From Swiss-Prot:
Keyword Glycoprotein listed: no
Full protein name: GID complex substrate-recognition subunit 4
TM spans (from-to): none
GO CC, alphabetical: cytoplasmic vesicle membrane; GID complex; vacuole
Gene symbol of the encoding locus: gid4
Family, as annotated: Belongs to the GID4/VID24 family.
Swiss-Prot/TrEMBL keywords: Cytoplasmic vesicle, Membrane, Ubl conjugation, Ubl conjugation pathway
Pfam families per the UniProt record, alphabetical: Vac_ImportDeg
Amino acid sequence: MKGCSFLRNGAKFQGKQKGVSSSTLEVHVTILHVNLAKSMLCGFIHVSYTSPNNTSLTTYFEAEIIGNRFTFETKWPEWGASEEIDNRHWKRLGALKSNGKDIPLRLIQPYDPLSRETVYMRWKELAMLDKTVDYQNHNQSFPFGISYEGFYYISFSQSTGKIKGYYYHHSEPEKVLFLELNPIIDRTFPVIEFQ
């Protein structure tokens, strides 16, 4: 699986984020930079909600690729995840199975993430890019009840480019938001003119 064409600089994905209620948000993700040597990538997440005023929110995120450098255990205490929460979310994504048995997170050995069909990641939104509304003012709510203070548990299929994930925020641990994205296939190629 080395050299996956979907996990690259400039890759784009689109899909939906669904909550426990009937609300569904349109989501577009652009990968800006992939650094496999450091097991990291970064990009933008653009969320939009079809409403009378077509509300949207764009954030910058950074990702930890699980494998050689980052483990399945969330190491950042301020993210509010515990081993139990990590287990629950990774199991939903099929990450902790071996020969049909569950494996404790602490027993999973470092591995080359690109040697497997599914790449697992944590995506953490770090900054909001939209300046139309002051969302940092605590008197105002985020559009359509979302926040960017939590993080995503992500599974990425190298063969199809499909992304699935679950959003977790420690202040709302029972709120389940499911993310599902498909790659945007760019069937164009650059035009070169020789003179």
